[in-house]
């Protein structure tokens, strides 16, 4: 079965079995909602077990979650440093114009049919995502995911077409 990374357990939270998760999910509210099924992977990326979320809340930059049948710190402490993943079957459906991070990362980015680079990371600093584009011989380009900049995303062909607004590329 294919799994996709959605977060890392960085610490425990209190004594009642809550865990502090650093999310890398594109849809954290949906991914960590009550009843969601996730998989735990150890620090060597080996499958450990399936888990069901019974509670979720945001606290600062973390998602605080609790798993079914794990209601005490002693039951969860061993999972610090583990990765949470979602199976391909549990990803859910997307709306038009929505994409999963794993679909975007690695895509080739073009401006006027000239290759700029490849998406290496997606940041969530505020109102819109920012795609980090790795370029040959230049610093990474921070590309806001907004309509005037990102013209088209072709998932099957792993291609993004953009129009760089003035000031976006400080190396020109």
UniProtKB/Swiss-Prot annotation:
Q: Where is the signal peptide?
A: none
Q: Which UniProt keywords apply?
A: Chaperone, Cytoplasm, Ribosome biogenesis, rRNA processing
Cellular component per GO, a single term: cytoplasm
Taking every annotated instance into account, which residue ranges of this chain make up the domain PRC barrel?
A: 96-168
This protein's record includes keyword Transferase: no
Question: Which GO BP annotation is one of this protein's?
Answer: rRNA processing
Q: Localized where?
A: Cytoplasm
The GO terms describing molecular function are: ribosome binding
**Function per UniProt:** An accessory protein needed during the final step in the assembly of 30S ribosomal subunit, possibly for assembly of the head region. Essential for efficient processing of 16S rRNA. May be needed both before and after RbfA during the maturation of 16S rRNA. It has affinity for free ribosomal 30S subunits but not for 70S ribosomes.
Q: Which family does it belong to?
A: Belongs to the RimM family.
Entry comment, domain topic: The PRC barrel domain binds ribosomal protein uS19.
Q: How does it assemble?
A: Binds ribosomal protein uS19.
What's the protein called, per UniProt? Ribosome maturation factor RimM
Q: Which organism is it from?
A: Streptococcus pyogenes serotype M12 (strain MGAS9429)
Q: Which gene encodes it?
A: rimM
């Amino acid at each position: 079965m294919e799994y996709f990374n959605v977060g890392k357990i960085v610490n425990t939270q209190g004594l009642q079995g809550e865990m502090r998760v650093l999310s890398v999910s594109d849809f954290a509210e949906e991914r960590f909602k009550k009843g969601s099924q996730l998989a735990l992977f150890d620090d060597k990326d080996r499958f450990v077990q399936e888990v069901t979320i019974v509670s979720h809340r945001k606290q600062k930059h973390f998602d605080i979650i609790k798993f079914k049948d794990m209601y005490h710190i002693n039951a969860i402490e061993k999972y610090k440093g583990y990765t949470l993943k979602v199976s391909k079957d549990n990803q859910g459906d997307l709306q038009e114009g929505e994409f999963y991070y794993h679909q975007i990362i690695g895509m080739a980015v073009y401006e006027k049919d000239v290759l700029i680079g490849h998406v290496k990371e997606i940041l969530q600093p505020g109102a819109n995502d920012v795609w980090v584009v790795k370029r040959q011989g230049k610093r990474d380009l921070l590309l806001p995911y907004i309509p005037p900049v990102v013209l088209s995303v072709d998932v099957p062909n792993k291609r993004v077409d953009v129009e760089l607004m003035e000031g976006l590329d400080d190396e020109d």
